[in-house]
Amino acid sequence: GEGLGNLVCLDADTGKKVWDYRKIQRTISTCAIDPESGLLIASDYTGYVYCLDSKTGKEHWVYDTKAHMWSSPFVADGKVYIGDEDGDLVVLPLKADFDPKNDDPIFETNMLVPIYSTPVVAHGTLYVGTQTHLYAIEEKAGK
């Protein structure tokens, strides 16, 4: 069932806890960290996507997909790519000052079947595996 989760940052040299984030719910996905901005993106099964500072654990924003999420978020080229069980594919800006209540996603579409795999971008093409197909979406055209 759905339970409480805990995201913990450990010092790689000492193994000591640097910070922890207790708002995350049950998750089976991995986090994505953008090396340029230091932003960490995590998601949970209840459909929330969290943007944190990877060094401090400070929360910048939380986005609600309103559907269960099995896949991990993916970050590339200043964007966050997420898919959910309702088949929604969403691309969000990878920036600390994004405001989910007032700012729109960069791109949003429904694939008509659940997305259980992690979206991946390569050479300007977004690849999305659904329950039934593998799609290649030209990122600039959104096709």
Per-region residue spans from a language model:
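Noncatalytic, solvent-exposed loop/strand surfaces
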Residues: 1-143
